[in-house]
Amino acid sequence: MRQTKTGILLANLGTPDAPTPEAVKRYLKQFLSDRRVVDTSRLLWWPLLRGVILPLRSPRVAKLYASVWMEGGSPLMVYSRQQQQALAQRLPETPVALGMSYGSPSLESAVDELLAEHVDHIVVLPLYPQYSCSTVGAVWDELARILARKRSIPGISFIRDYADNHDYINALANSVRASFAKHGEPDLLLLSYHGIPQRYADEGDDYPQRCRTTTRELASALGMAPEKVMMTFQSRFGREPWLMPYTDETLKMLGEKGVGHIQVMCPGFAADCLETLEEIAEQNREVFLGAGGKKYEYIPALNATPEHIEMMANLVAAYR
């Protein structure tokens, strides 16, 4: 019997190619055109997106990207490439490709890269620990479109999420412990997850339940009392209600109530990016301190740390 050759596809959201209004506009147009992300009627959404949102948001968002841009590109791209390279070193007999839902490298280029290595089985690992239709679902949709154009398709193993994976929880817990050892134990550990519209959850997206699962498992691994750990949601967009409580409003409230020391982790982000390094580490720090808080630290994402790479290797091992 011929032995199956397996490849691994690491998938993430994507990023602009440069911190310029033009590059950000191209990226946002692709991102915000996905029905998994915004499911508003196209007749209403297209004029709003092209006539208002892209012209107004692109220059502003480009400045935010410029504030965190790294020598090798956007933080998400730099750390994602490091993850790909480290996992390939950890699994030298297994091709590892990186693909983004929006921007480059695309998911299609990642599939083609693996097929060029003559793999006949692909393990797809979306780097979203908690499933959502707007992230993991978007990867599934694009993968289906890509394979629909192929005469011969490989076997596919698709990892839905890993919200309560033992290695993932332990890696998060060790990261928190290291931060506590460096900065002292805070009055509160705040776990900030990317938000989604509340309507998506009402219609069946189990993302909030998966976030609660991670929060519960992490608090248990740390041995922290429930009142010392809080879960919030960030990065809301548009006018409809999103999952609550909102991170920025919660930090303002906590500062006003006299909570002095907070540390914030974003367990849903496998790699640091604009939403963690600018929104959480900078903007929300100012919100908390401006409301009366005294001390605020952001705990970095797992990025390409050895524990994170080992977690990925163990996660895909069952499918290889």
From Swiss-Prot:
<keyword id="KW-0627">Porphyrin biosynthesis</keyword>
<keyword id="KW-0408">Iron</keyword>
<comment type="subunit">
    <text>Monomer.</text>
</comment>
<keyword id="KW-0963">Cytoplasm</keyword>
<dbReference type="GO" id="GO:0005737">
    <property type="term" value="C:cytoplasm"/>
</dbReference>
<keyword id="KW-0479">Metal-binding</keyword>
<protein>
    <recommendedName>
        <fullName>Ferrochelatase</fullName>
        <ecNumber>4.98.1.1</ecNumber>
    </recommendedName>
</protein>
<dbReference type="GO" id="GO:0004325">
    <property type="term" value="F:ferrochelatase activity"/>
</dbReference>
<comment type="function">
    <text>Catalyzes the ferrous insertion into protoporphyrin IX.</text>
</comment>
<dbReference type="InterPro" id="IPR019772">
    <property type="entry name" value="Ferrochelatase_AS"/>
</dbReference>
<dbReference type="GO" id="GO:0006783">
    <property type="term" value="P:heme biosynthetic process"/>
</dbReference>
<keyword id="KW-0350">Heme biosynthesis</keyword>
<keyword id="KW-0456">Lyase</keyword>
<feature type="binding site">
    <location>
        <position position="275"/>
    </location>
    <ligand>
        <name>Fe cation</name>
    </ligand>
</feature>
<comment type="pathway">
    <text>Porphyrin-containing compound metabolism; protoheme biosynthesis; protoheme from protoporphyrin-IX: step 1/1.</text>
</comment>
<dbReference type="InterPro" id="IPR001015">
    <property type="entry name" value="Ferrochelatase"/>
</dbReference>
<dbReference type="InterPro" id="IPR033659">
    <property type="entry name" value="Ferrochelatase_N"/>
</dbReference>
<dbReference type="GO" id="GO:0046872">
    <property type="term" value="F:metal ion binding"/>
</dbReference>
<dbReference type="Pfam" id="PF00762">
    <property type="entry name" value="Ferrochelatase"/>
</dbReference>
<dbReference type="InterPro" id="IPR033644">
    <property type="entry name" value="Ferrochelatase_C"/>
</dbReference>
<feature type="binding site">
    <location>
        <position position="194"/>
    </location>
    <ligand>
        <name>Fe cation</name>
    </ligand>
</feature>
<comment type="similarity">
    <text>Belongs to the ferrochelatase family.</text>
</comment>
